[in-house]
């Protein structure tokens, strides 16, 4: 009898459970999507769509995506309050400078821009502690902006770093799509390329400001380069010449040329003779690459780089003063 009562009770319990399940409404949202936060479109999203994505074809990614940072970098999401400000600067001083009538013209960038732009709150030091202007693990079709959280359009040093990064990455994209004679360019300083920041970490150890880290550098000049990051590869060297030119005055570039050809001195005549030969070689490489890039930009982009330099620097300075 007890066994019958127990079986009856279990059967009744099962029926009640099935009835409850049939009355419960199913959630129309897929369980596959539950791991992802439901994102609502914001005013910032609409501004980005209208001012960056639609006119330039660039998708801006500012929400956290854990898989988009390179291994070993210290990155975190950007503060929302700075995103529009940094994108406005990129648009005005980077993209629109190229589109000026006296530079490349309205249609110059069509189909030639990165298709995705990632924003990060902090910097991008690599395994050697050297800050980078881009993410070397990404292709030239993808672009990154760092230090969004500390960006201030009225700070000349922060604006300098931003535009160095923007022009470096735009140059990388353009030389990817509009080919240059890499083999010929490589022969000029190919013996100096390191492929790593290990050898430049020590010379950069005392650099603190953006200008000190990314500006024209005497150590680099005396070895035939514009900047410290030029040592990494032919592509970096090429892009750095363009980027450094568009963010430096003609006098600053001229002074770098003088530095390249000025030998160090020593009390030992033999050492002095060696220094003189090193300076002669550095100057030769510096000016050959400078001429190579100027000719390439003129012939293939139909842009006078020196004229664009003056325009770019004036626009950057005016923008900083306005903010």
Question: Where are each of the predicted segments found?
Answer:
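Bacterial N-terminal signal peptides that target proteins for export
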Residues: 1-10
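Acidic/polar, low-complexity intrinsically disordered N-terminal segments immediately downstream
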Residues: 5, 21-103, 107, 284, ...
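C-terminal motif of bacterial Sec signal peptides marking the signal peptidase cleavage site
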Residues: 16-20
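Auxiliary, metal-adjacent structural segments of Zn-dependent hydrolase domains
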Residues: 25-26, 84-142
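Second-shell loop/turn segments in exported
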Residues: 72-81, 149-161, 224-232, 279
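Surface-exposed patches in mature extracellular/periplasmic domains of secreted proteins
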Residues: 97-121, 177-186, 252-262, 304-312
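Active-site recognition of the HExxH zinc-binding catalytic motif
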Residues: 156-184, 239
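Metalloprotease/metallohydrolase-associated module, dominated by Zn2+-dependent proteases
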Residues: 194-266, 270-277, 281, 285-290, ...
């Amino acid at each position: 009898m007890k066994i019958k009562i127990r079986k009856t009770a279990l059967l009744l319990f099962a029926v009640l459970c099935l009835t409850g399940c049939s009355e419960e409404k199913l959630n129309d949202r897929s369980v596959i999507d539950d791991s992802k936060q439901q994102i609502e479109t914001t005013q910032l999203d609409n501004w980005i769509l209208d001012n960056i994505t639609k006119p330039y074809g660039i998708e801006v990614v500012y929400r956290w995506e854990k898989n988009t940072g390179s291994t070993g970098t210290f990155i975190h999401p950007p503060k929302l309050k700075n995103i529009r400000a940094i994108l406005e600067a990129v648009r005005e001083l980077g993209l629109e400078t190229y589109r000026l009538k006296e530079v490349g013209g309205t249609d110059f960038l069509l189909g030639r821009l990165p298709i995705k732009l990632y924003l990060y709150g902090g910097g991008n030091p690599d395994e050697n502690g050297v800050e980078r202007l881009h993410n070397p693990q990404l292709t030239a079709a993808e672009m990154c902006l760092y230090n969004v959280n500390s960006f201030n359009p009225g700070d000349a040093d922060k604006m300098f770093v931003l535009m160095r990064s923007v022009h470096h990455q735009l140059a990388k994209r353009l030389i990817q799509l509009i080919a240059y004679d890499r083999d010929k360019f490589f022969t000029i300083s190919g013996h100096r390329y390191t492929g790593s920041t290990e050898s430049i970490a020590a010379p950069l150890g005392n650099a603190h400001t953006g200008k000190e880290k990314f500006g024209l550098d005497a150590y680099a000049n005396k070895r035939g380069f514009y900047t410290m990051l030029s040592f990494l590869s032919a592509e970096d060297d090429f892009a750095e010449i363009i980027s450094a030119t568009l963010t430096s005055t003609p006098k600053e570039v001229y002074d770098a040329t003088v530095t390249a050809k000025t030998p160090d001195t020593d009390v030992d005549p033999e050492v002095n003779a060696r220094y003189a030969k090193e300076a002669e070689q550095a100057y030769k490489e510096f000016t050959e690459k400078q001429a190579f890039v100027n000719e390439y930009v003129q012939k293939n982009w139909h842009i006078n780089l020196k004229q664009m330099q003056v325009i770019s620097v004036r626009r950057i300075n005016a923008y900083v003063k306005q903010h």
